[in-house]
Amino acid sequence: MPSFDIVSEVNLVEVKNALDQSNKEITNRYDFKGSDARVELADKIMTAYADSDFQLDQVKDVLLGKLAKRDVDVRCLDYAKVEKVSGNKVKQAITVKVGVETDLAKKLVRLIKDSKLKVQASIQGDAVRVSGAKRDVLQETIAMVRKEITDFPLQFNNFRE
């Protein structure tokens, strides 16, 4: 029985490379001279530091540009609230979301079941496994999911006959 997995994966090596490039650009830019603007990575959480809210937005713009150039989908980023640090400085945590969260997985399963296509969807950890009798029906399912879910980056892999 043919099947495939719906997953959400992010290449963390590319995220680290984009972060390094961002820090290099921030240290060399004239408008950041003498400031404490930087981006740090710890596990899957990036933290952007700056002297003001305006500079923080500039740091995030640089980071998003570098991530986009390295083919990292920026829809997988989750922004926390901006926090005041000592003095006038601000910081913001940016989480890289990896894997299909349970509420999104339930939404995917419900969407697939409501579509009346002859496929079965099941949640397996941080992925959704979809299996069906025919390959054509699975391809229709992929097209339908791509059309319906646009706010979160999804990949379709492990396609088996």
From Swiss-Prot:
Source organism, top-level taxon: Bacteria
A GO molecular function held by the record: nucleotide binding
Record key words, sorted: Nucleotide-binding
Record has Membrane as a keyword: no
Species: Laribacter hongkongensis (strain HLHK9)
Name of the featured protein: Nucleotide-binding protein LHK_01423
Function: Nucleotide-binding protein.
Keyword Amino-acid biosynthesis: no
